[in-house]
Amino acid sequence: MKKRSQVFCIFIAMVLLILPLSMSDVPEICKICGEECERFCFKRRFRFCCYDYGFMKSDDESPSLQIPNV
């Protein structure tokens, strides 16, 4: 049991080290919504977390999780 928790801790540490490298574009989007939303973005790795958590009001009342076509 102890060995399993050690492996889990190492895995979490590796993930925490790798995540910031793959999220360079997320904070810019989240700064619109403020610190709290930015925190959720880092947790969720989710571009539209502001809509998801209701920190930013969208044009329509229902938050959308889809990425719009450009």
Swiss-Prot record:
Localisation per UniProt entry: Secreted
Cellular component terms (Gene Ontology): extracellular region
Cystine bridges: none
Keywords: Disulfide bond, Secreted, Signal, Toxin
Signal sequence, start to end: 1-24
Description of post-translational modifications: Contains 3 disulfide bonds.
Record's keyword annotation contains Secreted: yes
One function term, GO molecular function aspect: toxin activity
Tissue: Expressed by the venom gland.
Keyword Isomerase among UniProt keywords: no
Family, as annotated: Belongs to the scoloptoxin-20 family.
Protein name in UniProt: U-scoloptoxin(20)-Sm1a
Organism whose genome encodes this protein: Scolopendra morsitans
